[in-house]
Amino acid sequence: MRISSTLLQRSKQLIDKYALYVPKTGSFPKGFEVGYTASGVKKNGSLDLGVILNTNKSRPSTAAAVFTTNKFKAAPVLTSKKVLETARGKNINAIVVNSGCANSVTGDLGMKDAQVMIDLVNDKIGQKNSTLVMSTGVIGQRLQMDKISTGINKIFGEEKFGSDFNSWLNVAKSICTTDTFPKLVTSRFKLPSGTEYTLTGMAKGAGMICPNMATLLGFIVTDLPIESKALQKMLTFATTRSFNCISVDGDMSTNDTICMLANGAIDTKEINEDSKDFEQVKLQVTEFAQRLAQLVVRDGEGSTKFVTVNVKNALHFEDAKIIAESISNSMLVKTALYGQDANWGRILCAIGYAKLNDLKSLDVNKINVSFIATDNSEPRELKLVANGVPQLEIDETRASEILALNDLEVSVDLGTGDQAAQFWTCDLSHEYVTINGDYRS
Amino acid sequence: MRISSTLLQRSKQLIDKYALYVPKTGSFPKGFEVGYTASGVKKNGSLDLGVILNTNKSRPSTAAAVFTTNKFKAAPVLTSKKVLETARGKNINAIVVNSGCANSVTGDLGMKDAQVMIDLVNDKIGQKNSTLVMSTGVIGQRLQMDKISTGINKIFGEEKFGSDFNSWLNVAKSICTTDTFPKLVTSRFKLPSGTEYTLTGMAKGAGMICPNMATLLGFIVTDLPIESKALQKMLTFATTRSFNCISVDGDMSTNDTICMLANGAIDTKEINEDSKDFEQVKLQVTEFAQRLAQLVVRDGEGSTKFVTVNVKNALHFEDAKIIAESISNSMLVKTALYGQDANWGRILCAIGYAKLNDLKSLDVNKINVSFIATDNSEPRELKLVANGVPQLEIDETRASEILALNDLEVSVDLGTGDQAAQFWTCDLSHEYVTINGDYRS
């Protein structure tokens, strides 16, 4: 079953993640412009400051966000949360983001710095309480506000805003830290009425590599008009099934933030919770958020595999998710995946210690566990456990083939209900230990 | 801050764990005899079968146990649980243990095999429902009952039982799997009345390396007479503060069992919950169990460090424990320890995402975090966070010295109450990934 380290190395080198996952073109939502610069906060001179701006004036924009639940919340998280609450999710027209410094665990001074970033952008756009701020990078260090201030001046001055592909890609680059590729996704959707709209998203993160790299940021913007409460409901639903369903190392940072702006630049009736299109848009946003979140796992520190953990036929969604998370976070499952070992025992074990809300969710005699190939090769499914009974004579050749894939699926059929949850995880490699054992040095 | 890999290698080689942690002599509780053999279940011919026997007839023995809460419980766990319940914790006079095969996820046949092991030993001692069984090793494989049966005959036949140091050490060896040294602890205690008694314990485990190596087993025997309910209460209390407070990789196996026998061979009044000595014996058993549990962490797979996580001045014991566990299980904290990096950010982060029962347990403005040297060098304490404020000018030379130690302490003072909890953990190394990436192969 063991694959030689040479082969592992080779299969790793075969993936040019930038070529595979970074788009080369795209169209973007109406009424948004973006700006970016290298402020100097990042010592190597890379892009490290970005602004997303809503320029549509036809109707008020709406905003929603999901923030980290870590009890140590960074200054930009606390500050943006307050802005959003005061604005009641309306008239947020700018997001300013910097990388290189997370402005986290920086006390009162850090809170002031976050507010100054907001005030600088509010001044530029001539509006009050209309800007959200986000920061990512090293924690426990103060922002170099002179550089940030000069950078914001530059973006609103000589650097100019743009709405073309390169501008969006550069903003996606400006929020990166240990990411090996920028994460930009854009997609057009159609509603039954024929109305077309666009979702564009960016994310950063290459591990819940908290909080030194202070961590997961995600932005989604759309030109569809969505009422603010409906928008928050959609984003919360989508985040629960996307950004909250990924595991690199199971650590949640002080800065995690996912936010969404809807500017209503498309001339159609505003969608609220009672609209007939509400459910469809919610699902489209969810699927879109999943694509974005999956890119974070694909860039998981040191990872060689992208693994979908699919828990189905569960009594409750929440318990399906708890089981998917338990498998996805298990160090033993992750090392087995790295070692390309069809170790069903570790998967069962992680299911067995998951802390379920309802014990009836799991019946040890009904469970089915399989590896699923994602490359159209046959047989697609390799059964490891059938109705609670381990398959002692597994086709080891086929197991090797599936486990050698860069993408694969672990399928768990609980057989206790009709609910399902997915998680996306990566393997735990020597490289992960090297990256995280040496980072701060 | 980074220590060269050569230095890491060297500091690792300096620890001869066998010489440091395996006793060379010891005295044992009255009325117990032990037997052992190499049954052939382990292919390499190592010891793999052991029996602990109570021979004291002066009064009935008592027994207690704490079993894994994993929903996939191995056959010996389910079978022993039933024996203990039927016996109501009384008249258990033998424990039979094998290594090399965990008899886990083996269905009805596995249940029968576990019962046969019990029946064989019951027959030998001429008693009914008096034997507990435990197994550890590979899961999903059936026990080779012919070898087990021959082995039990040998132990009760030509191999003979003994109560000397070598017999005890050999039983400790017979329960090992990936352990690099046998874990045997024996100690004499004195009660205020002048009565002396002995605790002897054995454990196996080198990681919660579940369930392939199927995992943590611990046995404690004493010659003190302890009423069965009081014994269960003591063992549960002790396990909560010892075997349940260790982390190698956070995975809990299908076979985890800690059990305790008290044979009352010492001529003194039986201790029950109302006895004046109850609290003292409980604390002595707890401290003893901690010594035994710590040996499991010291043998943690691939580990180079033994780290005590000390959470004090907490509002509740349970929340102190949840925080200690969160720090101890964090992959980022573990890799930072391996990299000898004074990364307080990762420790704060793990504290911040711990799922507390009472949010008032954590006040982000009151928290103190330090590294503590354990080698009597000064200054003993290196403050990383004081009253919620990170110490930005840490003495990096001193940090390097403390982090280069094989033993160190992470101290977290929550400042919200007067409760405390401890966890013992180890670092996450390249070696761990190698061991667990390649195991089943």
Swiss-Prot record, chains A, B:
Of the GO CC terms on this record, one is: mitochondrial matrix
> Is Amino-acid biosynthesis there in the keyword field?
yes
Q: Give the pathway listed in the UniProt entry for this protein.
A: Amino-acid biosynthesis; L-arginine biosynthesis; L-ornithine and N-acetyl-L-glutamate from L-glutamate and N(2)-acetyl-L-ornithine (cyclic): step 1/1; Amino-acid biosynthesis; L-arginine biosynthesis; N(2)-acetyl-L-ornithine from L-glutamate: step 1/4
> Which InterPro entries does this UniProt record tie to the protein?
Arg_biosynth_ArgJ, ArgJ-like_dom_sf, ArgJ_beta_C
State the active site: T215
Keywords from the named record? Acyltransferase, Amino-acid biosynthesis, Arginine biosynthesis, Autocatalytic cleavage, Mitochondrion, Multifunctional enzyme, Transferase, Transit peptide
Task: Drop me one GO molecular function for this one.
Answer: L-glutamate N-acetyltransferase activity
Keyword Transit peptide applies: yes
State the activity regulation: Inhibited by ornithine.
Give the EC class as a word: transferase
Site feature Cleavage, where: A214, T215
User: Which E.C. number(s) belong to this protein?
Assistant: 2.3.1.35, 2.3.1.1
Site (Involved in the stabilization of negative charge on the oxyanion by the formation of the oxyanion hole): residue numbering on this chain: T136, G137
Question: Which reactions are catalysed by this chain?
Answer: N(2)-acetyl-L-ornithine + L-glutamate = N-acetyl-L-glutamate + L-ornithine; L-glutamate + acetyl-CoA = N-acetyl-L-glutamate + CoA + H(+)
Q: What post-translational changes are documented for it?
A: The alpha and beta chains are autoproteolytically processed from a single precursor protein within the mitochondrion.
The family database entries (PANTHER family) matched by this protein are listed as: ARGININE BIOSYNTHESIS BIFUNCTIONAL PROTEIN ARGJ (PTHR23100), ARGININE BIOSYNTHESIS BIFUNCTIONAL PROTEIN ARGJ, MITOCHONDRIAL (PTHR23100:SF0)
Q: What's the family?
A: Belongs to the ArgJ family.
Q: What does this protein do?
A: Catalyzes two activities which are involved in the cyclic version of arginine biosynthesis: the synthesis of acetylglutamate from glutamate and acetyl-CoA, and of ornithine by transacetylation between acetylornithine and glutamate.
* HAMAP family given in the database record: ArgJ (MF_01106)
NCBIfam families tied to this protein: ArgJ (TIGR00120), PRK05388.1 (NF003802)
- Tell me what this protein is called: Arginine biosynthesis bifunctional protein ArgJ, mitochondrial
